[in-house]
Amino acid sequence: SERFGPMSKIFFYGLFMDRSFLTEKGLQPETIGPAVLSGYRIHIGERATLLRSESSRAYGIVMELADEEARALYSEPSVRQYISEHVTVELLETGEAIEAYCYNLPPELALAGASSAYAAALSTLAEALQFDAAYVEEIAAFGEMS
């Protein structure tokens, strides 16, 4: 829509996959659909991040967000250390490859801490989104480690 200016596609893989998290913050994301990112694996410390891993896959939801909304979202204290990178994801429904941004923690921050509550919430969400059962278990395992 005109009034928001430029839009970006973002591959969300953490709790922001829940659109209501974003709409409660006053954002207006347009859901494009579930997708998979090859060559990365999920890691849950204090929050979720993706780490490069040749043989792995991470699942998420692609949404379109106004650039200014994305900037506002990632300027919040809990997520402002995340850095955007350019990725190509595959939409699960069509197999179409699309370019998107993905926000990850820098490697030196990625492994800090462990939040079993976050892991539990994210595994519940991943299950509700009907992601691969093995992937749901991979997320849930982070909750059992802490």
Mark where each language-model region is:
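Glycine-aromatic micro-motifs
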Residues: 4-146
